[in-house]
Amino acid sequence: MKNLLGSTIKDLENVALDYGQAGFRGRQIYNWIYNYRNKKKNIDQIEVLPLDFRKRLKDDGFKVSDLSIHERNLANDGTLKLLLSTEDNESIECVGIPTEKRLTACLSSQVGCPMDCKFCATGKEGLKRSLKVSEILDQILFIENEMNRKVTNIVFMGMGEPLLNIDDLLLSIRSINEDLKISQRKITVSTVAVPKMINKLSAKSFKILGNCQFTLAVSLHAPNQKIRETIIPSAKNYEIENIIEDCKQYVRDTGRRVSFEYLMLRGVNDKIEHANELSHLLKGFQCHVNLIQYNQIDEVEFQRACLKDLQSFQSRLSHNGIAVSLRKSRGLDKNAACGQLRQNARN
């Protein structure tokens, strides 16, 4: 353990004791990291600690951040996108999305993404590696420091497939909940759906967290297998009917409603017959559909569904008894919206 971010109070007390310090020094480090959310990122800046203790920690390679800000982009609607550099010279992006009462942090879980969804910029360069717990948590602290307010909600909808980094994902959720004091019910984990991993998510959540109170959002984006395979290559390995069955089991195991993300693509999946087919697929269990307007990226020629088709689609789902809402896009002018995050080339 060299990065102290992500450590429990017991971990930090043990670090202090290992260096011949009183246990309360570990609690001081804990407060400095989590309660004060200090903008300073170096061990030797923890001024509540004795100078000699700080020096020994730093000399031994301990730190409180693996990331640095390479670029800031503030959209007209107040959305902030940060391009962060990692210690191994990779790049990740995270987004702060403010409203009057909330600040939502959209977090990355991997450097790049292996899923290569055709409508998404993130997977165009493939997967480099998964993020560590400290790198996930640090995104929250950078957003808070840059926007000068506390994050209230978390969505794992940035770069990467969270369920392919499941252990660090769940350990970061534990720290977000226990250390940053953000309720699990204000955390959403989005997945394009990986075989066997939805069931594994619920089982591991109970093992690591003791419960499973966060929201699972499945990027469905199609009412049938044929359409889904054309826009999500990995769908060939996971039949849509099996995804739904695994989601039903997830609801039974956790008691939590599943959300389905549905990207509206003109002429692809946006017609009334698609709404009826989706309604039939989802009928009979606790779920919710988020309709998402497509956000343009350079490499593909998909287009947004027209407003009339979107409204008709939403109305038909509602008429068919499916809970549905329309997600508003944020940060479009700075490529900070859903599907637009990528490893931007750095100068």
UniProtKB/Swiss-Prot annotation:
User: Which cofactors does this gene product need?
Assistant: [4Fe-4S] cluster
**Any one cellular-component term (Gene Ontology):** cytoplasm
Q: Which Pfam families match?
A: Fer4_12, Radical_SAM, RlmN_N
Which SUPFAM superfamilies is this protein grouped with?
Radical SAM enzymes (SSF102114)
GO molecular-function term, one example from the UniProt record = 4 iron, 4 sulfur cluster binding
- In this chain, [4Fe-4S] cluster is annotated as bound at 113, 117, 120
Please list the reactions this protein catalyses.
adenosine(2503) in 23S rRNA + 2 reduced [2Fe-2S]-[ferredoxin] + 2 S-adenosyl-L-methionine = 2-methyladenosine(2503) in 23S rRNA + 5'-deoxyadenosine + L-methionine + 2 oxidized [2Fe-2S]-[ferredoxin] + S-adenosyl-L-homocysteine; adenosine(37) in tRNA + 2 reduced [2Fe-2S]-[ferredoxin] + 2 S-adenosyl-L-methionine = 2-methyladenosine(37) in tRNA + 5'-deoxyadenosine + L-methionine + 2 oxidized [2Fe-2S]-[ferredoxin] + S-adenosyl-L-homocysteine
- Superkingdom, taxonomy of origin: Bacteria
Q: Which cysteines are joined by disulfide bonds?
A: 106-338
Q: According to the record, how does the cofactor bind?
A: Binds 1 [4Fe-4S] cluster. The cluster is coordinated with 3 cysteines and an exchangeable S-adenosyl-L-methionine.
Q: Which residues bind S-adenosyl-L-methionine?
A: 160-161, 190, 219-221, 295
The annotated active site, in chain numbering, is 93, 338
Q: What else is known?
A: Reaction proceeds by a ping-pong mechanism involving intermediate methylation of a conserved cysteine residue.
The free-text function statement in the UniProt record for this protein reads:
Specifically methylates position 2 of adenine 2503 in 23S rRNA and position 2 of adenine 37 in tRNAs.
- What is this protein's name? Probable dual-specificity RNA methyltransferase RlmN
